[in-house]
Amino acid sequence: MATVKDSGFEALEKLKATEPPVFLAPSSISEDARSASQYLFMKLKPHNPKCPFDQLSSDGFDAEQIWQQIDMQSQPLLTSLRQEVKRFAKNPEEIRKLGKLALKVSHEDDIDEMDMDGFDSDDVDDEDKEIESNDSEGEDEEEEEEDEEEEEEEEEEEEEEKDGDNEGIEDKFFKIKELEEFLEEGEAEEYGIDHKNKKGVAQRKKQNLSDDEDEEDDDDEEEDVEFDAFAGGDDEETDKLGKARYDDFFGGKKETKMKLKDLSEDEEAEIENKGNEKLSTHERARLKLQSKIEQMEKANLDPKHWTMQGEITAAKRPMNSALEVDLDFEHNARPAPVITEEVTASLEDLIKSRIIEARFDDVQRAPRLPTKGKREAKELDESKSKKGLAEVYEAEYFQKANPAFAPTTHSDELKKEASMLFKKLCLKLDALSHFHFTPKPVIEEMSIPNVSAIAMEEVAPVAVSDAAMLAPEEIFSGKGDIKDESELTQEDRKRRRANKKRKFKAESANEPPKKALDTSTKNP
């Protein structure tokens, strides 16, 4: 076993000394790596009893198989290490015991080597005893140092508490420490005490109050000192009085604090009751009021429960916290009525009354608007056609080839008449709605009379225009008095009839001639 350990340790040191580029090239370093891994596996085997392998098998195995063996050892080893770390975190004192065991194991290994080299076992036992005695002395020293550190920490905490109580009163100009020093100096001057030695007295008192027996002795000594101070004494006694304080003569305002480790809960309660007995009723009331104020301030400053924070979202409250609370929701929709016997009976009565009255209130369907226009009814002529079949085909082809010359239908004539009436209406509306005259629209078929161009102008020269040559009767001729039908003479009736005929002929001449409808039927 010693040879395996030595060879594995040497291989491990060799791997540490090799440079990284050497691993890339094929060399004998793979054998060193395998022996080093075997060495580490054997070292970790005692700490991992759950490992299924006693040793690392590397002969005839490739790198992946070796890594799998190491992985099977490392997984339970990590769990055991975590458990050990947790155990040490709970009990830190076990780390020292573990260190002692490690020292003993190392000493035993050294003893074995010394036995192999020829040393006596008695010498080794003496050395072990010396080491144990040194360890015990070192432990005692460490414990004393720890106790001193704890005492210093407690003193610092007491000073911090005092400073924290006075923070609300102090400011830039007023400080309580300076006030206390000033008062102590005044008291020292009154009683002839040296004020410079007060720090030494405070340290001495703290040392004397560490144990109960020492406290009693110190109280006796202080009483003697007080008696000597009033009675007078030698120079040595005056030096002792120089270290005295005001609290030594008249008693302190606050009780001395003892170690919390040495006091039980009953003793702490007794000390608090003693301190409260010395306080007046006004001071006790102030203490109670101060404690209530502190509790209320703490309640206001501490984060409130999520149920007391008003409107809150799911992201701001703990997970699944709403399952334990009865929440009130505000619904916008009207809740469904609870179905009871009264509700069902009223519904049945309502249905029966509607059936008797035949008042079913069926939903009326909305009328559908026509999506397509009505088809035009074709005009059918039952009369026999006078044209031949060839003429009919010719007329249809001519209509398809020249749609402009297609014969007008009755609907086309109606459309044309409607457009003419609308134009006349628009002309009259334009004349009524404008301050100036609106000219007539351009006539489609315009006749060009044989007249000089200057005479056709709207504003013609005086020499050319005929306005100056016309008589007033020609410019404006009155129609005369309007006569009733019974007042007309025979000549008036003839004249009126001639005017009507003249107008009718003029209108018929301007209108296009109407084509006669073809009443003939087509030949089959």
From Swiss-Prot:
A motif (Nuclear localization signal 2) lies at residues 373-380. GO terms for molecular function: mRNA binding. It is found in: Nucleus; Nucleus, Nucleolus. A motif (Nuclear localization signal 1) lies at residues 85-92. Its main location: nucleus. Component of the ribosomal small subunit (SSU) processome. Interacts with THAL in the nucleus. Residues 169-180, 271-283, 480-493, 505-517 have a biased composition (Basic and acidic residues). Belongs to the MPP10 family. Involved in nucleolar processing of pre-18S ribosomal RNA. Residues 109-168, 181-191, 210-238 have a biased composition (Acidic residues). Signal peptide: none annotated. The lineage of its organism: Eukaryota, Viridiplantae, Streptophyta, Embryophyta, Tracheophyta. PANTHER family: U3 SMALL NUCLEOLAR RIBONUCLEOPROTEIN PROTEIN MPP10. Residues 196-207, 494-504 have a biased composition (Basic residues). Induction: By salt stress. GO terms for cellular component: Mpp10 complex; nucleolus; sno(s)RNA-containing ribonucleoprotein complex. Residues 100-243, 259-283, 479-524 are annotated as: Disordered. This is M phase phosphoprotein 10. InterPro entries: Mpp10. It comes from Arabidopsis thaliana. Residues 131-165, 257-302 form a coiled coil. One of its GO terms (biological process) is rRNA processing. Keywords: Coiled coil, Nucleus, Ribonucleoprotein, Ribosome biogenesis, rRNA processing.
